[in-house]
């Protein structure tokens, strides 16, 4: 009884932690490791969705902590009008709270379940899906579970891709440059995924887009059978029928998407050039995950809105996920940019670090612009292979004597960015760097500070 009382008391404390900023409402959905609730931001009155994850259950399942980190990292990478946005991540000792954009219109699946869509409606949703998927692929992200159940609608009827739990990043590729994990929903999965011989995640996503388009236009699946083996046979042969009510242009697009050979499957640029797709298409404007225009908004989300403070931003608890592991391992903090970010620790104050970075950047021929708090934007003065390279740098103080500095790719060529971080700036920063990400220096005793850190 006493133990149960303590657990209930702990739950109340955690609810107050969330309710201090968010009001929890009805349960929206539930999975093996998480529950998703409707919530309201008490500061702005906006509706949000809050995913509540139990850390103990994560720890008991091998690989789930890393999968959660990767999912959140990916959501931060792919900020786009047609992707469900992540607002912030909070944590207590027992739970992680992922605060996301709330899609009031529910699943696209619910619309299709009532019957097929008109071609005009199907086209609009498909245009938004392709725009989102193309953006994700441009960031190196393959979704791997595209289906109407993972496509939500906001109150304006705008499509939002969600559920990046199975998504893959470039570092998950094997030496052959392919993915090998078989995942996804069978009826929507590409034949090369089912064959377990390695596959290109982006090309596999396009097959799934083809199945989604078919479902929107027809109201049923192209490959379906109560026996999985027979359904797989249909998928391997691309054996399906297009109903007569589907227009010729739409039919031709489906045929080019549902091609068994991934090398011959239509690409996203080719999709966007087809007459059927181009009709009425207005490309959405994506939001850069580290754009200087978003600095102030990010500060409000992470700092609790103290726009007058010029102190370094401290990390929230989830950024370290420190209560999931022992020691002072910062490697999990900065996965939001994956390849497009480099991190080092320093024992110098954040102000000194930024001042040094500004001097080094200018010495390399970059213009330097200070942002709010301890943020700095460095921009090349000449065009590179893919426009002008721009790098955003931010210093965070995770303890009184430890600062963490993150480089993030803002614009320009990724290879040039990697060279900038790995070669160009390192010599000039040698006197302030304690360790680069991946090193294992002897760390000071700051575990308590990292567990309890909160917005400044």
Swiss-Prot record:
Residues 163-192 are annotated as: Activation loop. Coiled coil: none annotated. Keywords: ATP-binding, Kinase, Manganese, Nucleotide-binding, Serine/threonine-protein kinase, Transferase. ATP binds at residues 28-36, 51. InterPro entries: Kinase-like_dom_sf, NAF/FISL_domain, NAF_dom, Prot_kinase_dom, Protein_kinase_ATP_BS, Ser/Thr_kinase_AS. Residues 339-368 are annotated as: PPI. It comes from the Eukaryota. Pfam families: NAF, Pkinase. SUPFAM superfamilies: Protein kinase-like (PK-like). Its cofactor is Mn(2+). Belongs to the protein kinase superfamily. CAMK Ser/Thr protein kinase family. SNF1 subfamily. PANTHER family: CALCIUM/CALMODULIN-DEPENDENT PROTEIN KINASE KINASE-RELATED, CBL-INTERACTING SERINE_THREONINE-PROTEIN KINASE 25. This is CBL-interacting protein kinase 16.
């Amino acid at each position: 009884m006493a133990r149960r009382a303590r657990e209930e008391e702990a739950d109340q404390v955690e609810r107050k932690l969330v309710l201090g900023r968010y009001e929890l409402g009805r349960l929206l959905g539930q999975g093996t490791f998480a529950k998703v609730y409707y919530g309201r931001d008490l500061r702005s009155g906006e509706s949000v969705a809050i995913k509540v994850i139990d850390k103990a259950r994560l720890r008991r399942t091998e690989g789930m902590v890393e999968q959660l980190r990767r999912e959140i990292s990916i959501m931060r990478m792919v900020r786009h009008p047609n992707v469900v946005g992540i607002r912030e991540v909070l944590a207590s000792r027992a739970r992680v709270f992922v605060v996301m954009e709330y899609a009031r219109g529910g699943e696209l699946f619910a619309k299709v379940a009532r019957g097929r869509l008109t071609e005009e409606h199907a086209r609009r949703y498909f245009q938004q899906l392709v725009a989102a998927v193309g953006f994700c692929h441009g960031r190196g992200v393959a979704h791997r579970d595209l289906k109407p159940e993972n496509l939500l609608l906001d109150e304006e009827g705008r499509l939002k891709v969600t559920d990046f739990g199975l998504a893959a990043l470039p570092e998950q590729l094997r030496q052959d440059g392919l993915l090998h994990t078989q995942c996804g929903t069978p009826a929507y999965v590409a034949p090369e995924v089912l064959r377990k011989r390695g596959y290109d995640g982006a090309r596999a996503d396009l097959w799934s887009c083809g199945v989604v388009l078919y479902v929107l236009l027809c109201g049923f699946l192209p490959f379906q059978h109560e026996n999985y083996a027979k359904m797989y046979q249909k998928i391997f042969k691309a054996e399906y029928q297009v109903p007569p009510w589907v227009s010729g242009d739409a039919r031709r697009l489906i045929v080019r998407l549902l091609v068994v050979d991934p090398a011959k499957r239509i690409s996203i640029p080719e999709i966007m050039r087809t007459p059927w797709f181009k009709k009425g298409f207005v490309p959405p404007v994506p939001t850069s995950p580290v754009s200087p225009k978003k600095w102030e908004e990010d500060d409000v989300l992470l700092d609790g809105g103290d726009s007058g403070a010029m102190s370094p931003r401290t990390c929230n608890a989830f950024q370290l996920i420190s209560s999931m592991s022992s020691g002072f391992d910062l490697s999990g903090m900065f996965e939001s940019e994956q390849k497009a970010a480099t991190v080092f620790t320093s024992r110098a104050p954040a102000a000194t670090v930024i001042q040094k970075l500004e001097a080094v950047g200018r010495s390399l021929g970059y213009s330097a612009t200070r942002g709010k708090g301890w943020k700095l934007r460095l921009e090349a003065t000449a065009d590179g292979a893919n426009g002008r390279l721009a790098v955003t740098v931010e210093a965070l103080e995770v303890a009184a004597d430890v600062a963490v500095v993150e480089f993030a790719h803002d614009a320009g060529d990724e290879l040039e960015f990697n060279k900038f971080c790995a070669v160009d700036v390192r010599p000039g920063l040698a006197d302030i760097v304690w360790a680069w990400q991946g090193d294992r220096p002897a760390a000071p005793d700051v575990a308590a500070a990292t567990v309890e850190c909160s917005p400044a």
